[in-house]
């Protein structure tokens, strides 16, 4: 990954059709996005088995759903969501809401082995049902 610098106020983009996820940077197991909501947009309640996330509210206000609770998401709020924690977002307070998401993907030995095998199998030539 190369050095990255950006001004969120200059790169933010909004769409009323769908949520805007703008990739900021992407490393091997670490990446960042700018999530731009318009009023009414929702990220449904969900969880990630192998992903830790940090959310920083940069602009506007919305509702953060975490482990069955609701909390206001306003500028300055920083939320750490460890792997396995249920969370979601609801843009119900401001016309526009901007949240920076920083993600760290945990890669365990067993999962890494499966990923390597899957990648290797994709590269092997196949004749019928057998590998050459």
Question: Each predicted region: which residue ranges?
Answer:
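A short, N-terminal "cap"/entry segment at the start of jelly-roll beta-barrel domains
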Residues: 1-30, 44, 114-132
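Conserved short histidine dyad/triad with adjacent acidic residue
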Residues: 33-48
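Glycine- and acidic-residue-biased ligand/ion/polar-headgroup-sensing regions
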Residues: 50-52, 57-62
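Ligand-binding loop in jelly-roll beta-barrel domains
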Residues: 83-110
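Short acidic-glycine-tyrosine-enriched beta hairpin
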Residues: 69-83
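Conserved hydrophobic "DFG−1" position in protein kinase catalytic cores
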Residues: 34-36, 56, 91
């Amino acid at each position: 990954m190369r050095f990255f610098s950006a001004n969120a106020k200059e790169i933010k983009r909004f769409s009323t059709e769908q949520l805007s996820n703008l990739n900021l940077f992407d490393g091997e197991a670490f990446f960042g996005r700018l999530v731009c909501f318009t009023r009414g947009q929702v990220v449904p309640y969900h969880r990630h088995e192998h992903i830790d996330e940090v959310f920083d509210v940069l602009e506007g206000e919305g509702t953060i759903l975490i482990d069955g609770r609701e909390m206001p998401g306003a500028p300055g709020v920083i939320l750490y969501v460890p792997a396995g924690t249920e969370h979601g977002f609801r843009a119900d307070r401001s016309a526009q809401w901007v949240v920076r998401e920083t993600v760290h993907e945990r890669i365990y030995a067993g999962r890494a082995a499966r990923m390597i095998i899957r990648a290797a199998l994709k590269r092997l030539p196949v004749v019928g049902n057998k590998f050459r």
